[in-house]
Amino acid sequence: MIKLTRRQIIRRTAGTLFALSPIASAVAKTVRAPQFTAARIWPSHTYTRLTLESTAALKYQHFTLDNPGRLVVDIQNANINTVLHGLSQKVMADDPFIRSIRAGQNTPTTVRLVIDLKQPTHAQVFALPPVGGFKNRLVVDLYPHGMDADDPMMALLNGSLNKTLRGSPEADLAQNTTPQPGRGRNGRRPVIMLDPGHGGEDPGAISPGGLQEKHVVLSIARETKNQLEALGYNVFMTRNEDVFIPLGVRVAKGRARRADVFVSIHADAFTSPSARGTGVYMLNTKGATSSAAKFLEQTQNNADAVGGVPTSGNRNVDTALLDMTQTATLRDSRKLGKLVLEELGRLNHLHKGRVDEANFAVLRAPDMPSILVETAFLSNPAEEKLLGSESFRRQCAQSIASGVQRYINTSVLKRG
């Protein structure tokens, strides 16, 4: 038998007690626990997003309760801090989905969030790895419970976004009382889908003065919509508020409306502040045809990673679909882009004198002429000032609308 000295017995006993102590265990876990660094809420009529940013990946589980409706999210190996304590103050009174949020330390190692709901919801809870300027993120998306199964956003959640989506815009056309432009032989008014880039969690490019691309392009898109509707066209937008819409859903929204034209509007940045000018891009599935186009292709296609898309969702339209009627669509996209570029060239210096090409995910529609407009560079001091001007934004919108009108008159209406 091994004999222990009195000092050895005391040391072993103390070590065992400390190891078994709940307090000691909690303290040990506290040291390793991720720290919450930011919390954001993005309310919209499409869906509301809650984002928790942390220093390390979070383990979580969630469930719902009824009467009243609540979503409960338990975050393991975590400790409440000032970020979570301030979460309730971030809830907006006009949030369509969230009534209030409570956060507390449910157990020594578990933080519990209780989200009081205003209506029945479909909740998506998922984690995102670090990307761009973001750390690890835990995302809670709340969608209306009765969302139409054919809605492109619901198709993304169900993993069926790659199915060919065809909407029935006839009901919308019947309700539109704007003046009637010329019609094709089938009597259908031209349909235009405008796509303001980025939104919500994804700010897009940010100028040295703090101007965010997502706000600039939404302003331009709204004015473009007004200009086109004044001409009598049927105009829709992929987003009309500060909300993140995945790239594939943007394409699907246009296809669901059977859009004759899809215009994605941006105001990007480049590594050098000297880069300037307006540009128009069309799809090239083989990749970019210039170094600038390659840079923009990478930044724009990264939007889903920055904005946050559940990994179970199909992010983009299936590339197999691109074989369908692709030649005619690309030809029409080039014609549309050329006409819009000509109009924009009267307003601002052109980055290139021709339509550039890149493999932009948001342009991957097999049957919808699509272009991406870079209105100007937020990274250029002079153009940052222009983009901050309401007058320049309005002129951008007018130029885009004029180019679209020329395309519709020479292509869409002629073929009926």
UniProtKB/Swiss-Prot annotation:
Signal peptide: 1-26
PANTHER family (alphabetical): N-ACETYLMURAMOYL-L-ALANINE AMIDASE, N-ACETYLMURAMOYL-L-ALANINE AMIDASE AMIC
Subcellular localization, as worded in the UniProt entry: Periplasm
SUPFAM superfamilies from the UniProt entry: Zn-dependent exopeptidases (SSF53187)
Entry protein name: N-acetylmuramoyl-L-alanine amidase AmiC
Cited Gene3D superfamilies: 2.60.40.3500, Zn-dependent exopeptidases
Stored Pfam families: Amidase_3 (PF01520), AMIN (PF11741)
Catalytic activity: Hydrolyzes the link between N-acetylmuramoyl residues and L-amino acid residues in certain cell-wall glycopeptides
EC identifiers of the protein: 3.5.1.28
GO biological process, one term: cell wall organization
Keyword Hydrolase on entry: yes
Family in the record: Belongs to the N-acetylmuramoyl-L-alanine amidase 3 family.
General function of this protein: Cell-wall hydrolase involved in septum cleavage during cell division.
Cysteines joined through disulfide linkages: none
Keyword line: Cell wall biogenesis/degradation, Hydrolase, Periplasm, Signal
Chief place where the protein resides: periplasm
Residue ranges constituting the MurNAc-LAA domain according to the UniProt record: 192-405
Keyword field contains Signal: yes
UniProt source species: Neisseria meningitidis serogroup B (strain ATCC BAA-335 / MC58)
GO CC terms, sorted: outer membrane-bounded periplasmic space
Sample GO molecular function, one term: N-acetylmuramoyl-L-alanine amidase activity
InterPro entries linked to this entry: AMIN_dom, MurNAc-LAA_cat, N-acetylmuramoyl_amidase_3
